[in-house]
Amino acid sequence: MDKTSLKPGSTIGIIGGGQLGRMLAMAAARFGYETIILEPQAGCPAAQVANRQIVAAYDDPKALAELAAASDVITYEFENVPVSAADKLAETALVLPPPAALEISQDRFTEKQFLNESGIETAPWRLVDDEETLIAALGALGGRGILKIRRLGYDGKGQVRLASLDETQACNAFAAINKAPAILEGFVEFEREVSVIAARDRSGNVAIFDLAENVHKDGILATSTVPAAISVQTAEAARTAAEKLLHALDYVGVLGLEFFVLKDGTLLANEFAPRVHNSGHWTEAACAISQFEQHIRAVAGLPLGNTDRHSDCVMENLIGDDIEKVPAILCEKNAVLHLYGKKEARAGRKIGHVTRIKPRTI
């Protein structure tokens, strides 16, 4: 550890109190760190395992001042933290990953632009401000695409598929997203979806986990399988892109980068998340060091850990009524269960995950 590394007993502030914040707090505790959560919902999943919670809005000035004063470093568990709040914290505290990464990722336009400018290929896309630009974008992209709101869309929300040049359908689609600023992403025939979980420390060192192959259902991640059924060359291209992105952002922490894989093995970046990622939960059961520990290591100024995988695995999200599967899962021989402490199992709500491991093959 260098002189700037956090010593045991230091405090890590975490903005956001969901399951990602919970698992970050648990990882921090293993290193002897205390955690303080800023989250408006009292008794949130992260607060259940943290030392303290500030119950306030993410942009509450008094709460931000309290968090900054109490923390040796501040991180966040989701990408829709108000950038103004992160910038305010950064005036008096160390905020990692840097707020600039938040700002870029919060807007699909700036995200796609940054990826392309960093030499990372994406599906073709066009900016959409109104019906006229949407119709023009459809024409430019061959009459097919996915209309996506620029901000606050996640788990498939704020998206409409378009499959023709019909202007009425285009106008209806724009109305369906409440005429919000958007992009139109060209439709691509992909063979599979994969993601890479990568980390960069304060000195610029990079460590990357094996790629996961992801399956989504209703816009929400259903399973992540490792190893992904891709070539060595495709996997290496994804790792290279992730490393390129980490350096371009001057990033510190863990980042998730998602790709479409075309039939010929070509990779098209879909999006990145400047945080620990749902498709990296498998690392908790199949690696010596999880993505959560890796993130804590990075932001605390500790050396990055070994990302080697000791097992093959399939991570399955438990959503809503899947809570009823828990008794059976507990009887499975090689299933690692993690529940998030949520008080209500609503439809579409992630309440936990299970990772089924088996001996490593490749």
From Swiss-Prot:
Reactions that this protein is recorded to catalyse: 5-amino-1-(5-phospho-beta-D-ribosyl)imidazole + hydrogencarbonate + ATP = 5-carboxyamino-1-(5-phospho-D-ribosyl)imidazole + ADP + phosphate + 2 H(+)
Pfam families according to UniProt: ATP-grasp, PurK_C, RS_preATP-grasp-like
SUPFAM superfamilies per the UniProt record, alphabetical: Glutathione synthetase ATP-binding domain-like (SSF56059), PreATP-grasp domain (SSF52440), Rudiment single hybrid motif (SSF51246)
Record's GO cellular component terms: cytosol
GO terms (BP aspect): 'de novo' IMP biosynthetic process
Domain of life: Bacteria
Keywords, in A-Z order: ATP-binding, Ligase, Nucleotide-binding, Purine biosynthesis
Binding site for ATP: 108, 148, 153-159, 185-188, 193, 216, 270-271
Pathway: Purine metabolism; IMP biosynthesis via de novo pathway; 5-amino-1-(5-phospho-D-ribosyl)imidazole-4-carboxylate from 5-amino-1-(5-phospho-D-ribosyl)imidazole (N5-CAIR route): step 1/2
All copies of domain ATP-grasp, residue ranges: 112-300
EC number of the protein: 6.3.4.18
InterPro entries, sorted: ATP-grasp (IPR011761), ATP-grasp_carboxylate-amine (IPR003135), ATP_grasp_subdomain_1 (IPR013815), PreATP-grasp_dom_sf (IPR016185), PurK (IPR005875), PurK_C (IPR040686), PurT/PurK_preATP-grasp (IPR054350), Rudment_hybrid_motif (IPR011054)
GO molecular function, one term: phosphoribosylaminoimidazole carboxylase activity
Family indicated by similarity: Belongs to the PurK/PurT family.
NCBIfam families in the record: PRK06019.1-1, PRK06019.1-2, PRK06019.1-5, purK
Record's function text: Catalyzes the ATP-dependent conversion of 5-aminoimidazole ribonucleotide (AIR) and HCO(3)(-) to N5-carboxyaminoimidazole ribonucleotide (N5-CAIR).
Assembly notes: Homodimer.
UniProt protein name: N5-carboxyaminoimidazole ribonucleotide synthase
Organism expressing this protein natively: Brucella melitensis biotype 1 (strain ATCC 23456 / CCUG 17765 / NCTC 10094 / 16M)
Organism classification: Bacteria, Pseudomonadati, Pseudomonadota, Alphaproteobacteria, Hyphomicrobiales
